[in-house]
Structure formats: C-alpha cells, structure tokens
Swiss-Prot record:
UniProt cross-references to Gene3D superfamilies, sorted A to Z: YjeF N-terminal domain
Boundaries of every YjeF N-terminal domain copy: 10-227
Entry-linked HAMAP family: NADHX_epimerase
Cofactor note: Binds 1 potassium ion per subunit.
Function, in words: Catalyzes the epimerization of the S- and R-forms of NAD(P)HX, a damaged form of NAD(P)H that is a result of enzymatic or heat-dependent hydration. This is a prerequisite for the S-specific NAD(P)H-hydrate dehydratase to allow the repair of both epimers of NAD(P)HX.
Name of the protein in its database record: NAD(P)H-hydrate epimerase
Molecular function terms from GO: metal ion binding; NAD(P)HX epimerase activity; nucleotide binding
Presence of the UniProt keyword Ribonucleoprotein in the record: no
Alphabetized Pfam families for the sequence: YjeF_N
Organism in which the protein naturally occurs: Roseobacter litoralis (strain ATCC 49566 / DSM 6996 / JCM 21268 / NBRC 15278 / OCh 149)
Keywords: Isomerase, Metal-binding, NAD, NADP, Nucleotide-binding, Potassium
Organism classification: Bacteria, Pseudomonadati, Pseudomonadota, Alphaproteobacteria, Rhodobacterales
Enzyme class, first EC level, given as a word: isomerase
Binding-site list for K(+): 63, 142, 179
NCBIfam families reported in the protein's UniProt record: yjeF_nterm (TIGR00197)
Amino acid sequence: MPDILTASQMRALETAAFNSGAVTGLELMERAGQSVIDALFSSKAELATGEHRAVILCGPGNNGGDGFVIARLLFVLGWQVRVYLYADPEKMPRDAHANHDSWVDLVPECTQRISFPSVLPAEAERFGDEAFGNGEVDVIVDALFGIGLNRPLSGLHPILATCHANRHEAYFVAVDVPSGLGENGPLEAADWSVFPADLTVTFHRPKQAHQNGLSFCGKIMVQYIGL
C-alpha cells in the first residue's frame, strides 16, 4: 500500500471493505465524523470543553454525510451548530441521506438550504452574517467536496469568497481535503477558490491532493478509521 493515495486507490480500499463485510458505509461515515472531532480537539484543546459554536457546510456527496455526522456529534456535546446544505437531500447517496435525516430529525430548525448548483449572492450574504456577524463562531467545517473533485466550484464562489474575507474570524476545518483542491492542485487560479483550511483531517493515508496543495491544507492530520 503506497504512503500517499490517489482518490481511486482510496475508493478501492473502501469498496473492498464494504464487499468483505468488514464495515458498512454508515459505520465508516460515523467513524469519519468522530475522527474529525477527535482531531479538532487534539489540535485545539480549548474547544474540547465549554460551550462553542460551529457552522458546517455540507455538500451533495458522502463528504456532506460526514458533515452531518460531525454536526450531530457536536450538538450532542452541547455545541450550537448550524448546517448549510449545498445539495438536494433527496439526491444524496443513501448513507449521506440517512445522516441528513438523522440530523434534521434531531434539530430541524438548524439547517439552511442554499441554492444548488449556484449559490445566490443574498444567500452568501446571509451565511456571512450568521457565521461571522456576531464574532462568536468558533469553527467552520468544510464538508462540501472530498477527494477526486475534478471541476471548478464556480457555483460556490460567493461562499468561498466569504470564508476568505473572514479568514481570521474562526478555525477552519476541511474534511478529507479543502473543497476546490483537485488531485493535481487547485482547480482554479484564484487562491480564494479553495476553502481556507487551518486543519485538514483526512482518513487512512495522506492523499495526492494534499501533496499538490499543501499551502491550502493548513495542518494535516491523518485519522485511522479501520480500513
């Protein structure tokens, strides 16, 4: 097994684990979400106790499903959590959809849909006001897109630009890889087109995207999830 994995190699590992019966997709998603929280608390010990506030950006795939697990687990720990969903939940993969439903059933009033595939400027302004307006947000989690992304995120430009404009107002955490970073580097030339991570939490092994975009990843922590 190579020390650095491509997206296709990681997916092959996951598929082999599912096919062997070693783990289900839901179990793996739960482990991934918990491992992000473990890494967050290891990196920022002051967040492990007390009341804090998180904003979670969830995308249309399994990375978004990880985000819903993170939201639920932080809420259970006593955090104030707001989710922004960049997806049609009915079109999400089965396991991601299940975790969406678990979150919405738990806290129905704390999820805000944003237009997919193109975020409206007014929605980005609302996101900025709610996430950064009162200066109390502690953590922004990027669970929009994971490894293997191969197209620019032009529809998300207003959200990404808002994150960059408030770069020092919160601790920015990327799940697996910062959104907007492809396997060979940024998918667009502008620095603000990639989520500005302070911490990137990836699973099993470092990924090729990290090596080609180190300046966007912040601190990289590899978490083992039983593959």
